[in-house]
């Protein structure tokens, strides 16, 4: 019996070590996946979206030929200054108004990676789940159906951090607007003033459009059906984390 124990001991130890190694690898993979699906936006992502929104707002008024009259006519005979609207402080103030509020128009697209997960429009996952509801499938997200389209925790955090960053770097934005518009705002603000060089990776992430199916709606429908089947296989009452939608 002692001999048997002597033989089995190393075998059991080997099995135990194998189980521990397998569990460690699984836990690490799970952690990496959760890091990208359950996280708050980084400072890089906040700055990226802030600069994108501001440049987009300014681009809508950049071609205006309106001329503003500034100042008052005084007894000294000084005349009002005429300033092109496209170069005026008024234009910047109007672009900044409700800038961070517009961040709430973004949604979390959990099927995308990195900063690309934050985009306007409905995510593929949410579209699929709403399609299931329309077909009569009961989907449990832990929140009422009427709240599905409300801003998520991540997007709300984005908006708050946008306000904080804008307040902190207001002078930098003004300096760029009046003196450095030949440079992209994202480079001038994010790379030169807000972020250390080691934290700028998200600025280089760009949506290529290759992930979309431009023609061939059948292929898109097939993918949606496969996802629906995967969801309904779990049970008649599939559950999802609303933060991943």
UniProtKB/Swiss-Prot annotation:
Subunit structure: Interacts with TLR4.
GO molecular function: signaling receptor binding
Leader peptide range in chain numbering: 1-27
Expression by tissue: Highly expressed in lung, spleen, thymus, and uterus. Moderately expressed in kidney, stomach and placenta. Weakly expressed in brain, heart, liver, small intestine, skeletal muscle and testis.
Annotated stretches, region: Disordered: 207-245
Disulfide bridges in this chain: 44-202, 47-190, 100-162
Source taxon at top rank: Eukaryota
A Pfam family hit: DUF3456
Keywords on record: Coiled coil, Disulfide bond, Secreted, Signal
Name of the protein: Protein canopy homolog 4
Amino acid composition bias (Acidic residues), ranges on this chain: 216-230
Keyword Transcription: no
PANTHER family to which the protein is assigned, alphabetical: CTG4A-RELATED (PTHR15382), PROTEIN CANOPY HOMOLOG 4 (PTHR15382:SF3)
Function, in words: Plays a role in the regulation of the cell surface expression of TLR4.
Recorded coiled-coil stretches: 209-237
Cellular location(s): Secreted
Source species: Mus musculus
GO biological process: positive regulation of protein localization to plasma membrane; regulation of protein localization
Similarity-based family: Belongs to the canopy family.
Any one GO cellular component localisation term in the record: extracellular region
């Amino acid at each position: 019996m002692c001999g048997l124990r002597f033989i089995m001991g190393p075998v059991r130890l080997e099995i135990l070590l194998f189980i521990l190694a397998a569990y460690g690898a699984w836990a690490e993979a799970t952690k990496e996946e959760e890091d990208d699906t359950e996280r708050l936006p980084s400072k890089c992502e906040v700055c990226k979206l802030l600069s994108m929104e501001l440049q987009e707002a300014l681009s809508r008024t950049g071609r205006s030929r309106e001329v503003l009259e500034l100042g008052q006519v005084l007894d000294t005979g000084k005349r009002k200054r005429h300033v092109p609207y496209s170069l005026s402080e008024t234009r910047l103030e109007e672009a900044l108004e409700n800038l961070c509020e517009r961040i709430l128009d973004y949604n979390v697209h959990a099927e995308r990676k990195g900063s690309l997960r934050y985009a306007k429009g409905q995510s593929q996952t949410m579209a699929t789940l709403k399609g299931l509801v329309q077909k009569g499938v009961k989907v449990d997200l832990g929140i009422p159906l009427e709240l599905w389209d409300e801003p998520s925790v991540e997007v709300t955090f984005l908006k708050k951090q946008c306000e904080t960053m804008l307040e902190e770097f207001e002078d930098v934005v003004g300096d760029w607007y009046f003196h450095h518009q030949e440079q992209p705002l994202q480079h001038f603000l994010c790379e030169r003033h807000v972020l250390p060089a080691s934290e700028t990776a998200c600025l280089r992430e760009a949506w290529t459009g290759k992930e979309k199916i431009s023609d061939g709606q059948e292929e898109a429908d097939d993918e949606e059906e496969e996802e629906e089947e995967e969801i309904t296989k779990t049970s008649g009452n599939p559950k999802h984390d609303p933060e991943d939608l």
